[in-house]
Amino acid sequence: MASQGTKRPYEQMETGGERQNATEIRASVGKMVGGIGRFYIQMCTELKLNDYEGRLIQNSITIEKMVLSAFDERRNKYLEEHPNTGKDPKKTGGPIYRKREGKWIRELILYDKEEIRRIWRQANNGEDATAGLTHLMIWHSNLNDATYQRTRALVRTGMDPRMCSLMQGSTLPRRSGAAGAAVKGIGTMVMELIRMIKRGINDRNFWRGENGRKTRIAYERMCNILKGKFQTAAQRAMMDQVRESRNPGNAEIEDLIFLARSALILRGSVAHKSCLPACVYGLIVASGYDFEREGYSLVGVDPFKLLQNSQIFSLIRPNENPAHKSQLVWMACHSAAFEDLRVSSFIRGTKVIPRGQLSTRGIQIASNENMETIDSNTLELRSRYWAIRTKSGGNTSQQKASAGQISVQPTFSVQRNLPFERTTIMAAFTGNNEGRTSDMRTEIIRMMENAKPDDVSFQGRGVFELSDEKATNPIVPSFDMSKEGSYFFGDNAEEFDN
């Protein structure tokens, strides 16, 4: 972990700036989302979308994907070098939905990437505005986290599917930078490292030569990012051991899986940010609001206020429940896929139900789905209260790391205790002697055994009325502790497959 002096709030990572004070951070984050909004408005003009079509979340996602694809240098280079992929390396596009005679029709559009880049830069004062691109990536990642389960990916890397609460950001692209690294869960980092080690085991040249040197640097950097997410000395010491290994192999994989399991109780620091679809920023910019002047924060009241005042729509399939579709998008907007459902329900003011009980599939409509039967509905994205987003993992002050329910990685900084089945978690540690037994392992297991489920996390932290923008009067909710609060609990969500 870098020394305290170089730690920046994660909103700064988002804007790529040097150290800034709170006002400067608010201004640069405001500049970033304002740029996204201006770009979106311009794209709606280019595509001749009317007001209703511009507020359709599916159109927003297509436009977001186009700009991300236009700036994806590595993929663009790959497409140019492999012309037989059947894709035009210079073009990008996707489905745009329009309303004609009361029916929704799908139109596939194609644009020059160069043209999209020009529009994006023009909306961002001539700059590349990579922070804005990363912001869109995180919104897509949060949407995937709320929509899909990663059971298959977990099993493939030898991890337990019950560790899904550690998988935030698992679909973020490699190029998502510091802001992307901040929101990745422990399991996501572990999975990336395991994939890398497995390649090294199967491919003798992976760590060798000039390329191998770069690979090694990437490996150590990822180890350091993961180490920085752990909050106990023993977990960090184990990460040093994994990083310094001369020839990473099965022992390291076992150590990493052990660490991932330990994170179910001794939770890591994972940042949460409310990243909204581009159309929301577009609407607010169009209404004359000046984001840069007013300032903006991804972790405060601002995103809640935006959602209170924006009406956006979604296409809906015949047997889907509009309220459930709204819940899915609400969770994605607040990065709350791994939050305790009781906390989310309290903040939202409507019951938030587990994924398995939702009658809704993903937001995007596949190209082979029949548009005849597809309708549209308003998404209900408003909330009753707001709360500060956390990056701490909710560990109590008494011990550096506290009890964590299997399947919760808190999003909101709100007082609660985190019930968990210690037996379930500890059972995962038996009969695994492949990794090194060490003082660190013993110490980690001891800390886990001593963790008390009734310890209160985020002491005194509460939710706030939407009118309480300065967060002066915290309302500390009391929760019914008998109910299990995890979203993917007993689940049948679709798998995410790239």
UniProtKB/Swiss-Prot annotation:
Post-translational modification: Late in virus-infected cells, may be cleaved from a 56-kDa protein to a 53-kDa protein by a cellular caspase. This cleavage might be a marker for the onset of apoptosis in infected cells or have a specific function in virus host interaction.
GO molecular function, one term: RNA binding
Presence of keyword Ribonucleoprotein: yes
Keywords, sorted A to Z: Capsid protein, Helical capsid protein, Host nucleus, Host-virus interaction, Ribonucleoprotein, RNA-binding, Viral nucleoprotein, Viral penetration into host nucleus, Virion, Virus entry into host cell
Ranges in a coiled coil: none
Gene Ontology biological process terms from the UniProt entry: symbiont entry into host cell; viral penetration into host nucleus
Short sequence motif Unconventional nuclear localization signal: positions: 1-18
Subcellular location per the Swiss-Prot or TrEMBL entry: Virion; Host nucleus
Principal location class: virion
An annotated GO cellular component: viral nucleocapsid
Residue interval(s) of motif Bipartite nuclear localization signal: 198-216
Isomerase in keyword set: no
Region Disordered: start-end pairs: 1-22
Matches recorded under SUPFAM superfamilies: flu NP-like (SSF161003)
Subunit structure, as described in the record: Homomultimerizes to form the nucleocapsid. May bind host exportin-1/XPO1. Binds to viral genomic RNA. Protein-RNA contacts are mediated by a combination of electrostatic interactions between positively charged residues and the phosphate backbone and planar interactions between aromatic side chains and bases.
Family: Belongs to the influenza viruses nucleoprotein family.
Free-text function comment from the UniProt entry: Encapsidates the negative strand viral RNA, protecting it from nucleases. The encapsidated genomic RNA is termed the ribonucleoprotein (RNP) and serves as template for transcription and replication. The RNP needs to be localized in the host nucleus to start an infectious cycle, but is too large to diffuse through the nuclear pore complex. NP comprises at least 2 nuclear localization signals that are responsible for the active RNP import into the nucleus through cellular importin alpha/beta pathway.
UniProt-recorded name of the protein: Nucleoprotein
Organism in which the protein naturally occurs: Influenza A virus (strain A/Equine/Prague/1/1956 H7N7)
Gene (name only): NP
